[in-house]
């Protein structure tokens, strides 16, 4: 299992490199004006050197979070409750994060994110169940702030302070998304070195992340100016979002697809460690392999929707759901009690991550076309509620004391969930198949971005 994980990682990194090299040399740069502007390059660099340490700190916790709770001798059900608390915090944070950052200020919100995540990581040094639960709640809340506050600050400064053209924005976020994939891969390898090679234990990656957050805070305080968003009442934002959901069946179907798909992904995040860890898999390397597979999926999406192949995002969305269903079907057999096949399970997990790399840009495109910009915040808030509830209920109801049979049952239910998502996609496709608004024109490249 050890050698297999390393081979998968090396193969995926090589494939990602080939795809990115091909993409860079097969299309002319649309950002030549931006790249030729030294003021823009400096502004972009100043943003990246503050944003990337925060991203790295967020990723470092991923590989050994479940292992840490297991290391403290908590039962599977107790660990599930800790995760559910994190999901609950994410629901609440998703509802209040945008109004909060607008009222408090984006710069202060970035500092708040770093402080909350640092506190969350320091809580992991305790073996007290309540302290660990509190840390997970803080982590769930802070993660919802990460993308909203940093990217909102940059977008405002880009347009209002520096008066750069709006078409230069995708260039910054495309590069950020590419770097984010590389940072996640590096974070997994670094966590593996700390926890396993150096023998520092599963809490060490979280401790290592704190100095990165301190660096990010120092740079924000020293170099960033404050900016604010338009303040709207929480009731109005959610009310407008609910009305949009109810009046447009396409939006309702899209939200259902997102809730079903992403709740399965959340359950996968919980389950991959107890499936692979008993077979001595290097968890950090496995995590880096997942991130590499997701990066490959994102590159394949942009290749598939390019002028050469011209697949539509709706087709890619359907393909990603089919891939996840097939992977979950594999997992119901590879995790059968007494007949475990860890290599097949790892392969299935990699297919799920590959599908995620296809899914997120396709979903982002469809959301942008279907949901009016002024109502997106409210609609996305409503999307997040069933997403987190489904994931939380799945963990609480199905994960019984015998984790092996419980895990297999969870994968079976997740496969059924993906079938429901597939039915929703077919229904949505039938409804919009002649809608040119939801088709990607041959001349329009789909910009990448963080999700």
UniProtKB/Swiss-Prot annotation:
Transmembrane segments: 1-21, 45-65, 79-99, 130-150, 180-200, 201-221, 251-271, 281-301, 316-336, 346-366, 378-398, 410-430
Gene3D superfamilies the UniProt entry points to: MFS general substrate transporter like domains (1.20.1250.20)
CDD domains: MFS_MFSD5_like
Topological type in the membrane: Multi-pass membrane protein
Main subcellular location: membrane
Subcellular location as annotated: Cell membrane
GO biological-process terms attached to the record: monoatomic ion transport
SUPFAM superfamilies: MFS general substrate transporter
Keywords: Cell membrane, Ion transport, Membrane, Transmembrane, Transmembrane helix, Transport
Record Pfam families: MFS_5
Signal peptide from the UniProt entry: none
InterPro entries associated with the record: MFS_trans_sf, MOT2/MFSD5
One Gene Ontology term, aspect cellular component: plasma membrane
Example GO molecular function: molybdate ion transmembrane transporter activity
Job of this protein: Mediates high-affinity intracellular uptake of the rare oligo-element molybdenum.
Similarity comment: family membership: Belongs to the major facilitator superfamily.
Annotated protein name in UniProt: Molybdate-anion transporter
Source organism of this protein record: Xenopus laevis
Organismal lineage: Eukaryota, Metazoa, Chordata, Craniata, Vertebrata
């Amino acid at each position: 299992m050890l050698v297999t994980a390393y081979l998968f990682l090396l193969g995926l990194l090589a494939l990602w490199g080939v795809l990115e090299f091909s993409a860079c040399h097969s299309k002319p740069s649309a950002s030549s004006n931006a790249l030729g502007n030294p003021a823009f390059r400096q502004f972009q660099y100043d943003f990246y050197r503050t944003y990337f340490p925060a991203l790295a700190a967020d990723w470092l916790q991923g590989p050994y979070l479940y292992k840490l709770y297991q290391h403290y001798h908590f039962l599977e059900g107790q660990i599930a409750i800790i995760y559910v608390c994190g999901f609950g915090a994410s629901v609440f944070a998703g509802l209040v994060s945008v109004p909060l950052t607008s009222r408090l200020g984006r710069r202060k919100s970035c500092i708040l994110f770093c402080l909350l995540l640092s506190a969350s990581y320091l809580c992991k040094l305790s073996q007290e169940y309540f302290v660990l639960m509190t840390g997970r709640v803080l982590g769930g809340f802070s993660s919802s702030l990460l993308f909203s506050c940093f990217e909102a600050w940059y977008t405002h400064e880009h347009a209002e302070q520096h008066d750069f053209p709006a078409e230069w924005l995708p260039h910054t976020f495309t590069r950020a998304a590419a770097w984010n994939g590389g940072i996640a891969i590096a974070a997994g390898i670094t966590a593996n070195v700390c926890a396993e090679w150096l023998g520092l234990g599963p809490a060490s990656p979280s401790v290592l992340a704190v100095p990165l957050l301190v660096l990010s805070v120092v740079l924000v305080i020293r170099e960033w100016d404050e900016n604010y968003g338009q303040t709207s009442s929480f009731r109005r934002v959610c009310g407008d979002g609910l009305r949009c959901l109810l009046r447009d069946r396409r939006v309702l179907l899209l939200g259902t697809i997102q809730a079903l798909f992403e709740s399965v992904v959340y359950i996968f995040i919980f389950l991959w460690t107890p499936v692979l860890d008993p077979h001595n898999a290097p968890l950090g390397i496995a995590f880096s392999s997942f991130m590499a597979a997701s990066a490959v999926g994102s590159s394949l999406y942009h290749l598939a929707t390019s002028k050469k192949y011209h697949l539509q995002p709706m087709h890619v969305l359907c393909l990603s759901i089919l891939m996840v269903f097939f992977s979950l079907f594999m997992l119901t057999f590879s995790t059968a009690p007494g007949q475990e096949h860890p290599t097949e399970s790892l392969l299935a997990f990699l297919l799920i991550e590959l599908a995620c790399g296809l899914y997120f840009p396709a979903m982002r495109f469809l959301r942008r076309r279907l949901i009016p910009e002024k109502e997106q915040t409210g609609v996305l808030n409503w999307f997040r509620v069933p997403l987190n509830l489904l994931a939380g209920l799945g963990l609480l109801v199905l994960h019984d004391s015998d984790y092996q049979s419980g895990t297999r049952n969870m994968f079976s239910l997740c496969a059924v969930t993906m079938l429901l998502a597939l039915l929703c996609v077919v229904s949505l496709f039938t409804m919009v198949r002649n809608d040119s608004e939801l088709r990607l024109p041959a001349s329009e490249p789909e910009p990448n971005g963080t999700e």
